[in-house]
Amino acid sequence: MTVKTRFAPSPTGYLHVGGARTALYSWLYAKSQGGEFVLRIEDTDLERSTQAAVDAIIEGMTWLGLEWDEGPYYQTKRFDRYNQVIDQLLAEGKAYKCYAPKELLDEIRAEQEANKEMPRYDANHPKIKAVNDAAKEGEPCCIRFRNPKEGSVVFDDQIRGRIEIRNDQLDDLIIRRTDGTPTYNFCVVVDDVDMGISHVIRGEDHINNTPRQINIYKAMGATIPTFAHCAMILGDDGAKLSKRHGAVSVMQYRDDGYLPEALLNYLVRLGWGHGDQEIFSRDEMINLFSLNAISKSASAFNTDKLLWLNNHYIKTSEPEYVAKHLEWHFENQGINKATGPALAEVVKLVGERCNTLVELAQQSRYFYEDFAEFDADAAKKHLRGVAKEPLMLALSKIEALTEWNTEALHHVIAQVCEELEIGMGKIGMPLRVAVTGGGQSPSVDAVMNLIGQERVIARIKMALEYIETREANA
């Protein structure tokens, strides 16, 4: 059997982390089994579905690198096929027309609730039967699936084990609305049959749909796929993950400076694991992934853990790869990458100090842009009269350099310390503030090397002017 999985989001909003984890698990299982992964857009909710949401889902999947082998398929383009199956079910007596108006169904539901009965549709209810018997062909009606009344639906969930639901607990599902549009639970089954889906991996909120869908598979004479229902993701407070917990959209994590590898690594561990291993490459995920290793219990989202992973991937990924993702943040922060060193060189120097690419872009700005003033606290502490002589000596030596590299600049600093008989801090910190505008940066010789000789000279002169002005105003 060829394994074929699918991710089938409804385009009523962005791709959230719960959906992304479901997509990841489906993608991983297909890849781990040498199978195929299908992307299907379930857009039968015409009122709520939007093209913007479709675009956001595809953008999120693409950013995560979850490439699909087939699709994207759109349910709204398959209405003829759904109607064909509905007509077949009607002809076989496995579906029927229901003329009961919504008002009557609401009235019956209220009566059932008042009598402490489970609210459900009953085709044999006297009021419903009377309406259906009196109806004439051509009057508005919906189509309902004739659910079996005897026996049970039993399936072996790959995560939760054996699940059994009695058929008398299930009512006759609407499969086509009065307006002629087919419904979600029906379309899903037809799609999975037509597309040859072997494994349905989805959230636990779909468990109640599964027995209803299995009965439709049986009515169609189709092979029933294997099901796996994943537990929900909770916020760090134990409540269901929602907007109030911060970013829940996949692309919001991109905007906040996360690498896709970090988010994928974090999501795969939200419910699945392999021993005590925390870091997984994409290939390791594929080779090690299994459905029966997914936990039945809900997982709590921990932003600190995600930040730790992101820092790991910024530090250990190829600098050119990190630089490719950093470009977006440079553009977003209005930094022109053409006015300074190669981004990959900056990543090598600054990357390990940053948890996100947003921080990395912010901390790299001085490589590409001159600043009008120094950080007030750093300048007050380090750009004082005592720093004037070391800076002037460093400036003269830097101006005289014919080779520009980190080693030569390190030698300049060492010479200043030796000639003036001062410690490294007496020149290192004033130089750092002079060339970066602030008090924190990687090794100042490496920083100056990337900034470039012309800019370094201009900035040291600016620092000396600052000191002179400060002394004059003292």
From Swiss-Prot:
Gene of this entry: gltX
Enzyme class: ligase
SUPFAM superfamilies reported in the protein's UniProt record: An anticodon-binding domain of class I aminoacyl-tRNA synthetases, Nucleotidylyl transferase
Family in the record: Belongs to the class-I aminoacyl-tRNA synthetase family. Glutamate--tRNA ligase type 1 subfamily.
Chemical reaction(s) catalysed: tRNA(Glu) + L-glutamate + ATP = L-glutamyl-tRNA(Glu) + AMP + diphosphate
Short motif ('KMSKS' region): ranges: 240-244
Record's function text: Catalyzes the attachment of glutamate to tRNA(Glu) in a two-step reaction: glutamate is first activated by ATP to form Glu-AMP and then transferred to the acceptor end of tRNA(Glu).
Pfam families assigned: Anticodon_2, tRNA-synt_1c
UniProt name for this protein: Glutamate--tRNA ligase
Motif 'HIGH' region per record, residues: 9-19
One GO BP annotation of this record: glutamyl-tRNA aminoacylation
Entries under CDD domains matching the protein: GluRS_core
Protein's cellular compartments: Cytoplasm
Subunit and partners: Monomer.
GO molecular function: ATP binding; glutamate-tRNA ligase activity; tRNA binding; zinc ion binding
HAMAP family linked to this entry: Glu_tRNA_synth_type1 (MF_00022)
PANTHER family from the UniProt entry: GLUTAMATE--TRNA LIGASE, GLUTAMATE--TRNA LIGASE, MITOCHONDRIAL-RELATED
GO terms for cellular component: cytosol
Binding-site list for ATP: 243
Native organism taxonomy: Bacteria, Pseudomonadati, Pseudomonadota, Gammaproteobacteria, Vibrionales
